[in-house]
């Protein structure tokens, strides 16, 4: 009877050990599953993090490129502003120069017209401005005791012989030929000035008032 009880106790211990081993294996299996699941989740997290890092890297690259582009645009706009201001200053200087030149021209023209009026009165000569510069046309009045003598003339401006002959004739009538010639010369200058093309000076023609630049493509 004692031997049977001893075997039962041994069997119980073996059975207990076996059951414990079963439980340990079951726990080990669960732990392995949890570890596998954890590793799987960790791998997913790493892959997600890697994708996120790649996106962040791309975004940082884009931000850097945009920042560099913005810097180029700011520099470009700075140069452009300086150029526009320089052009404005040149334009103002050119306008002032043209204004001064016009004032001088008008002053000179007034002086010439006044001189022409004086010479015309002194020599008694009227010169037809409309015929100039192609022809020298007009009339000289020679005062007389009873009546004035009219000396009309209508010559080609290049007819030197005819003009010399006319001057000799006027000189014989006591007309101051030097003043008469000066009158014709000044009238010729006025006629040539009136018929000259009113083109702006070369500097004004080259002056820039409007700049068309593609602001979407700044220079590097």
UniProtKB/Swiss-Prot annotation:
Keywords: Cell cycle, Cell division, Centromere, Chromosome, Coiled coil, Kinetochore, Meiosis, Mitosis, Nucleus
Coiled coil: 79-114
Domain of life: Eukaryota
GO (cellular component) term, any one: nucleus
One GO BP annotation of this record: meiotic metaphase chromosome alignment
Locations listed in the record: Nucleus; Chromosome, Centromere, Kinetochore
Disulfide bonds listed in the record: none
Keyword Nucleus belongs to the record: yes
Family of the protein in this entry: Belongs to the SPC25 family.
Physiological role: Acts as a component of the essential kinetochore-associated Ndc80 complex, which is required for chromosome segregation and spindle checkpoint activity during meiosis and mitosis. Required for kinetochore integrity and the organization of stable microtubule binding sites in the outer plate of the kinetochore. Participates in SAC signaling that responds specifically to disruptions in spindle microtubule dynamics. The NDC80 complex synergistically enhances the affinity of the SKA1 complex for microtubules and may allow the NDC80 complex to track depolymerizing microtubules.
Complex and partners: Component of the Ndc80 complex, which is composed of Ndc80, Nuf2 and Spc25.
Protein name: Kinetochore protein Spc25
Source organism of this protein record: Drosophila orena
